[in-house]
Amino acid sequence: MQPWHGKAMQRASEAGATAPKASARNARGAPMDPTESPAAPEAALPKAGKFGPARKSGSRQKKSAPDTQERPPVRATGARAKKAPQRAQDTQPSDATSAPGAEGLEPPAAREPALSRAGSCRQRGARCSTKPRPPPGPWDVPSPGLPVSAPILVRRDAAPGASKLRAVLEKLKLSRDDISTAAGMVKGVVDHLLLRLKCDSAFRGVGLLNTGSYYEHVKISAPNEFDVMFKLEVPRIQLEEYSNTRAYYFVKFKRNPKENPLSQFLEGEILSASKMLSKFRKIIKEEINDIKDTDVIMKRKRGGSPAVTLLISEKISVDITLALESKSSWPASTQEGLRIQNWLSAKVRKQLRLKPFYLVPKHAKEGNGFQEETWRLSFSHIEKEILNNHGKSKTCCENKEEKCCRKDCLKLMKYLLEQLKERFKDKKHLDKFSSYHVKTAFFHVCTQNPQDSQWDRKDLGLCFDNCVTYFLQCLRTEKLENYFIPEFNLFSSNLIDKRSKEFLTKQIEYERNNEFPVFDEF
């Protein structure tokens, strides 16, 4: 058995547990919906903390042909696996604080306490791998196998590979000084732009909405990328769905008084996303030329992107997105989404759905081009709320005894995709994948494993493998439901081609079978 893999999943008790179970390598039965949540009541679920990893013990995959040009460093054939350190002063990766006094940039949580390392595979009795599989070539991709359901892991005393994962998380910790400096620079530019936008009648009510990985406390690697959303409350609007997409809409005003400053952006009855974004971009471009104490330039517009991207001091990238704020009821397409009833409770779900929703000027795909007048639903503020209050217990992660590994798993998943994108950046195979795909899959895994004990920090290796297994399943089945809009498939063929999904599947499978050598690159 590969040292990174967990043991085979245990079957649920006969007390009525209905969570689907299958091997990631050899699923039996009909394909499962990758985002289907267990339908059993809480009493019928497996006991808290009973997990089951993705594959059967000792399962192997067919070797792929080596590609010497793309080969990452792996252990030499016949080399013995190194023992994991017996004990070390491991510290939980923390989110660094922001610049003092920055109103718009909230300081992340303080550093978390140390975690104990898992023992070596020799101590656990696991069989260590001695022969790494050769890395797959750029287009050496398999045919998709049978899909598997999201596994429920079986807890073990020592998670395989946990020591390496904690070392990776340690590497991903952000420097307090670096994050404070970067956050301070971003805040200065953002404040300057907000003041200027408020002087324009169309954007007079604009405000800052703190969203993105910095505010979710899951930022990794370096504080060189920030997402900023400028929200603008709009009067009563009417949404007209575009081409049964469930996520893209035309925006109309129910009433349009003559004094409405947004009337200048109307195309007939429709609020033109392209016109409004063009004016937004023009104001920002003019204003950054007046910022004297900081070097700021605007990057070229990306096709279909709703963001205005700025580069500060040649090293900090800031995506600024305009968002319309609506305090109306959420659209009907979201009715079956946000399935957190068994995780965070039905009460929390009801409270979250009472919050506003947002619309960003994201162009819908239309053939080989884009429909430039559409707006896309956005719930990034709800995502932040969930990640910052992620425990079934309200005290989860508030003290040393109740720490979970949810955010650590998300950071590792984001880093895995980030590293693979860096490795293949010249080949463009992975350009259409983003951290949002990883975060969406992670939310679905949280839904299917709602108990805090199912994310025990001692089971980091198993929990991470669970997330990897689910993401692979979504790639194979070409189905990843938007967490808020179930009928909107983020992995549909018109958004991401099949070949790219097969390529990413092959790369992730190789990484998992060889203890993730990509974590040691770059």
From Swiss-Prot:
It comes from the Eukaryota. Changing residue 394 to Q: Acetylation-mimetic mutant; reduced enzyme activity. Changing residue 349 to A: Impaired association with collided ribosomes in response to translation stress. Decreased interaction with histones H2A and H2B. Changing residue 173 to A: Strongly reduces enzyme activity and stimulation of interferon production. No effect on stimulation of interferon production. Changing residue 300 to E: Reduced nucleotidyltransferase activity. GTP binds at residues 211, 319, 376-383. There is a cross-link at residues 173, 285, 347, 384, 411, 414, 427-428, 479 (Glycyl lysine isopeptide (Lys-Gly) (interchain with G-Cter in ubiquitin)). 2',3'-cGAMP binds at residues 227, 319, 362, 376. The modification N6-lactoyllysine is found at residue 131. The modification N6-methyllysine is found at residue 506. Changing residue 482 to H: Gains susceptibility to mouse-specific RU.521. There is a cross-link at residues 231, 347, 384, 394, 479 (Glycyl lysine isopeptide (Lys-Gly) (interchain with G-Cter in SUMO)). InterPro entries: Mab-21-like_nuc_Trfase, Mab-21_HhH/H2TH-like, MAB21L/cGLR. Changing residue 140 to A: Highly decreases cleavage by CASP1 and enhances type I IFN and RSAD2 induction upon DNA virus infection. Abolishes cleavage by CASP1, enhances RSAD2 induction upon DNA virus infection but no effect on cleavage by CASP5. The modification (Microbial infection) Deamidated asparagine is found at residues 210, 389. Changing residue 157 to A: No effect on type I IFN and RSAD2 induction. Highly decreases cleavage by CASP1 and enhances type I IFN and enhances RSAD2 induction upon DNA virus infection. It is found in: Nucleus; Chromosome; Cell membrane; Cytoplasm, Cytosol. Changing residue 149 to D: In 20DE phospho-mimetic mutant; causes inactivation of nucleotidyltransferase activity. The modification Phosphothreonine is found at residues 68, 91. One of its GO terms (molecular function) is GTP binding. Lys-187 and Leu-195 residues are specific to human and destabilize the interactions with short DNA, shifting the specificity toward the detection of curved long DNAs. Lys-187 and Leu-195 also restrain cGAMP production and, therefore, immune activation, allowing a more fine-tuned response to pathogens. The N-terminal disordered part (1-160) binds unspecifically dsDNA and expands the binding and moving range of CGAS on dsDNA. The disordered and positively charged residues enhance CGAS-DNA phase separation by increasing the valencies of DNA-binding. The N-terminus is required to sense chromatin and its phosphorylation blocks its activation by chromatin DNA. When the N-terminal part (1-160) is missing the protein bound to dsDNA homodimerizes. PANTHER family: CELL FATE DETERMINING PROTEIN MAB21-RELATED, CYCLIC GMP-AMP SYNTHASE. This is Cyclic GMP-AMP synthase. It comes from Homo sapiens (Human). The gene is CGAS.
